[in-house]
Amino acid sequence: MTDPADVRLRDYTDLTDVALRRVREPREGLFMAESLAVIERALEVGYRPRSVLTGERWLPDVAAVLATYDSDAPVLVAEPAVLARTTGFRMHRGPMAAMARRELPSVAEVLAGARLVLVLGGLVDHTNVGAAFRSAAALGVDAVLVTQ
């Protein structure tokens, strides 16, 4: 990929605008998996990537993970400068995947069998949600509920 305006990169544009992202992601049925570990975890639990955006240096690992989960998602490879112009930030954590959202489970389904639950309410800025989920995983949380 050499042109940030390429239509295949649309899912990855303007990711630094919180208000736009909060509206666009749910409306378009996507979410971003930001790192190879997160992409792999999403694949592991059944999410399917619409595409993967990566730099050349991460391509072998991306290919291996996609092959493991029999994914035929398009892999978009670009130089660091094109990645930064497309996403609005320097991609230093590895590849990103635009993942297709599934229908949300009911609260009862999420809580079934859960002993320790994290509730995130009234979130205004999504930027710290990843840290909350990583902390929840480290603390053995069984379920996470996020209010609108």
Model-derived features with residue positions:
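Boundary-proximal intrinsically disordered activation/regulatory segments immediately upstream
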Residues: 1-67
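Short coil/turn connectors at secondary-structure junctions
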Residues: 27, 48, 71-73, 93, ...
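RNA substrate-binding interface of SAM-dependent RNA methyltransferases
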Residues: 37, 44, 76, 102-104, ...
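Short, glycine- and charge-enriched coil/turn segments that flank and shape catalytic ligand pockets
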Residues: 58-73, 107-115
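A short acidic, glycine/proline-enriched capping/turn motif at secondary-structure boundaries
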Residues: 58-60, 81-85, 92, 102-105
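A glycine-rich helix N-cap at a beta->alpha junction
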Residues: 67-88
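Glycine-rich phosphate-binding loops that contact phosphosugars or nucleotide phosphates
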Residues: 97
